[in-house]
UniProtKB/Swiss-Prot annotation:
Keyword terms: ATP-binding, Cytoplasm, DNA damage, DNA recombination, DNA repair, DNA-binding, Nucleotide-binding, SOS response
Membrane spanning residue stretches: none
Alphabetized Pfam families for the sequence: RecA, RecA_C
Lineage: Bacteria, Pseudomonadati, Pseudomonadota, Betaproteobacteria, Rhodocyclales
Subcellular location: Cytoplasm
CDD domains linked to this entry: RecA (cd00983)
Descriptive protein name: Protein RecA
Family: Belongs to the RecA family.
Record PROSITE patterns: RECA_1, RECA_2, RECA_3
HAMAP family, per the entry: RecA (MF_00268)
Organism: Azoarcus sp. (strain BH72)
Amino acid sequence: MDDNKAKALAAALSQIEKQFGKGSIMRMGDGNVEKDIQTVSTGSLGLDIALGLGGLPRGRVVEIYGPESSGKTTLTLQVVAEMQKLGGTAAFIDAEHALDVGYAEKLGVNITDLLISQPDTGEQALEIADMLVRSGGVDVVVIDSVAALTPKAEIEGEMGDQLPGLQARLMSQALRKLTANIKRTNTLVIFINQIRMKIGVMFGNPETTTGGNALKFYASVRMDIRRTGTIKRGDEVVGSETKVKVVKNKVSPPFKEAHFDILYGEGVSREGEIIDLGVDHKIVDKSGAWYAYNGDKIGQGKDNAREFLRANPALAREIENKVRVVLGLKELPVDGAQPAAAEA
């Protein structure tokens, strides 16, 4: 760059910093730009791997959507629990007025420290979210759900009033305000969303999410969660087999999938994932119905192997760390606990 151009640029940069504050513009090579994106685990090892960074990125908007009873709130509460384990503060904006506190506690959420709001209108919910984000004191904000963010005009109107596009405009305005503050305060904001059917669609996917298109654009990560089957013990249904597809990812390659089990009253089965991923990467041996690790049998059938790993957390952590090394993720600290002997 010649001297005149360099002087003109320096003057412009100086004026920008003077007018908008230091850090409003900078060179990428200055070292002040954050290169490593901080993440928080989803509570599912397979999903952390599918996301590419080892979890959900902080300072970004995330959307989790799917049909009813597919595990959207369960997955989100697991993220809240993981953030609290890291010493973070979480807020849950319960627009649906349907949060099961007992279930959240079973998933590992510290209810005492969880901030909860049950707003009356969509405007109130999004304003509360914006104030929490701007404070910089909250690490994760969950909005459950976009479909329940009812505009004030709709609540105050008559049943049957036609108010087209009102919720979409509300979401668009809120996200324009939220995005800059989310990045500045490094807050993770998760929107839970529902699925609707587009009427009259002959070709292509008739499914769409509520709240217009703004969230689709502003979200750095979008995840489609589906229940693919049931888990039974005898005749009793004890959980559901779940598939999550990362349909959008601005921080890593998208379109990856994760498969895991959600056990009722327990959440994502970490031990089940460790077994499946261990088998996939030849760390755990599977012969018929038996599972073995380092030549030692750990259980006949997945249920027994899962229970064995639950009883031996040090062994589970050892297998998980081997999986993490293979996949290029950071290892977790190992406890000093010794594994018990497996029962034949």
